């Protein structure tokens, strides 16, 4: 009798392990690696971000995305506890994607962060706005002018991102900010120094 009970126990443990593995695979399918900016700085890192799945049933597109993700390393982020939280858009955290390399995601998702073309337009608009605000101030060199454009474009991106994230839940925003600060490794004091140096120039 003891042999049968041991086998049954092993079988039930194996079933639990299979369930755990399948849940981990489902989590990985909803995340992908992308280039994102860190806060208001120009620092870009390649990290795992949640995939926003469209509500329309594009099974072919989803299968292509799954095949692409298996080539990279398999990790599950520690701040993803339920599938409902993973479906939220990654703009809730203080990051935005700059170079979205997958055209598949641009076609399928409606509320992704701006693609490179709108960003280029926003940089031109922000530089025109900067020139209109300060017509008497002429930059002494090309580098000063470029730094002003970069600073202004980062401010416009931040304001767009803030307006998008106001409609989403506040608790997820706080948890994702703290998780990103841990992942990025850049302390808030360093970010403050970068912001103050860009304001001085």
From Swiss-Prot:
Name of the protein in its database record: B-cell CLL/lymphoma 7 protein family member A
Origin: domain of life: Eukaryota
Gene source species: Danio rerio
Compositional bias annotation for Basic and acidic residues: 54-71, 158-167, 192-201
Matching Pfam families: BCL_N
Family: Belongs to the BCL7 family.
Region (Disordered): 46-201
Biased amino acid composition, Polar residues: 73-83, 93-114, 133-142, 168-179
